[in-house]
């Protein structure tokens, strides 16, 4: 069962497993006695350049008999009239066959290696019989859409007689044109009859925009009687043999179209043939363009001789097929339009490396575009242009590798070369919605390496955070921060100064984690650029960015202006709201950064200072009042103490006597209630002790802690322990013992109060 399934899969998908990169003409047409030249293309790898090339004829049973090969073999049928030439530098080989006969018609293969392998291409050769020539018959062979001139001689006696041209249709001749002014409706607007001067015995019929239906036998005639002069002509209208074009996937192709000066002022077009005779317009000079080619096609201005060219970049597999260029007032293929044909094959075994065709960036952010070029042309000039779709399309240059940058892109566009790497990088930052579009990577060398990339502007915020334009003071030190989120933790981080030829790297300082990002502040970084003793030369654009090896990532730009020193002191420029949350805007600098910590709102500083000033003023007022009245209070306090102390002693003695009496009265009261009373007092004291800073459970706190992360205030409350502290057991005491202890405490307190009363007036 499994074998059956595999067999079915191989039968359904043969093209996938046997797809060949060999390419040649699908059809070749010629006539007996002529010769043909057949070109076959192959990927120019080292193995392919040196392997065997062959031309073989397919048999009825599926075999393919070799007729000629690159190893010197020539079949007897081809002896003396055929050869095979290999062009390894171009990845092509050519088979030339002369002295064609109808026996040469058939199905052939051109290929590499062994005949039975899949590295081959099928070619159909059709050899037609030559025209049946009559006496004095002239043969005209002209391509479709072109112009033919049929010359008709006559004798002197017929110089003044009627001149005419007939076409043989079936058994009867049909008048096409004559000297009296008649024109057959099928030739209206594209035929004329010219009679030469009286000294020449010749008239000519010119037919423009030849159609396939124009082919056939014609008869020129001067005069209508038996003495008339007649001349036979055979007109063959040929479909143009397509020129083979073999290009790499992701590469570029150019179609050069030369239609002649007679159509110099007629609308031009390029179309691709689909099913049957339909030819869908790819681009024309009337402004039409197929959506599939948006952003990657240009129709170059036409010359006075009617020639023009069409460039297509970023080739795709689906671009392969037959293309026609032509001229017609409608801007599309019509019968009789002069045309040229190409057969485009897109080689999927491309030498052009893959690179992103779409790059996305956010407003205010940046993009880095990788552009491949031919390694053999490392010294070529590199360009980057913006594709514009108006009319025929154009691509004005924005930057090149020789230091030219378009004025409106200064400070935010740079072309960086990587010698020997086969790529160059274009960085564009400070993005706006107007930067969305298609861009082309070019060199002044190999035109096949033109590539296209589309830049899309999407919603979001830039990943790198820098201040806006900052101002430095001459002779002072400037410090500019750049905040990198954690996603770039493994990237190389850098600062550089922009100029027309690139961005010169500058030393920078890693100041540890950045607090501008709340999700992974330990992996985020703050990297600062420091300019010591600022001079006028330090003014300009500075970039901070990330890269991995030769691949550049995001960048952010800061413009540094330089001004004279001000009399009111210097100013330290740093990132305002540097540690703000990612969804907050980064303001221009003007606030001091303190030890890479979160910058607080300046208004908070002002409020705190105002409160502090108010407190200082209040404390000062109290101090002055206390010092001014201290002397008056000293005298009155002595008299008051001398009066109150004896009274207090009397009251204390009375209280003790009452306490002793009550204690004796409660002698037989249950001691459990007394113990409970003491326990209540002890727990109350325990709770009150916290007001003075005591905390028995050091692992728990009832205080709510406040933490500032990323400029946002986040409050984290710790959980207080619910475990109660048990009161330790104490020894039981009688009521008498308690009364005696209370009396001793009273005597000690009375002695202390008396001592303070005596010492107080002396110190005052």
From Swiss-Prot:
Q: Where is the composition biased (Basic and acidic residues)?
A: 609-619, 723-738
Domain called Ig-like V-type: residue spans: 19-120, 145-237, 250-352, 364-458, 462-561
**Which residues belong to the signal peptide in this entry?**
1-18
Q: Which UniProt keywords apply?
A: Cell membrane, Disulfide bond, Glycoprotein, Immunoglobulin domain, Membrane, Phosphoprotein, Repeat, Secreted, Signal, Transmembrane, Transmembrane helix
Regions crossing the membrane: 639-661
Instruction: List compositional bias (Low complexity) regions by residue number.
Output: 627-637
Give positions of region: Disordered: 609-637, 717-738
Query: How is the polypeptide modified once translated?
Result: N-glycosylated. N-glycosylation is required for anchoring IgA molecules to mucus, but is not necessary for Ig binding.
Positions of modified residues (Phosphoserine): 673, 682, 689, 735
The UniProt entry's GO CC annotations, sorted and at most eight, read:
azurophil granule membrane; extracellular exosome; extracellular space; plasma membrane; receptor complex; secretory IgA immunoglobulin complex
The processes (GO biological process) annotated in the record are: detection of chemical stimulus involved in sensory perception of bitter taste; epidermal growth factor receptor signaling pathway; Fc receptor signaling pathway; immunoglobulin transcytosis in epithelial cells mediated by polymeric immunoglobulin receptor; receptor clustering; signal transduction
List the molecular function annotations (GO) for this entry.
polymeric immunoglobulin binding; polymeric immunoglobulin receptor activity; transmembrane signaling receptor activity
User: On the Extracellular side, which residues?
Assistant: 19-638
Q: Which residues lie on this side of the membrane: Cytoplasmic?
A: 662-764
InterPro entries (alphabetical): CD300_family_receptors, Ig-like_dom, Ig-like_dom_sf, Ig-like_fold, Ig_sub, Ig_V-set
Q: Per its UniProt record, what PROSITE patterns does this chain match?
A: IG_LIKE (PS50835)
**Disulphide bridges, residue numbers:** 40-110, 56-64, 152-220, 257-325, 271-279, 371-441, 385-395, 482-544, 486-520, 496-503
Domain annotation text?
Answer: The Ig-like V-type 1/D1 domain contains three complementarity determining region-like loops CDR1-3, which mediate interaction with IgA and IgM.
What protein name does the entry list?
A: Polymeric immunoglobulin receptor
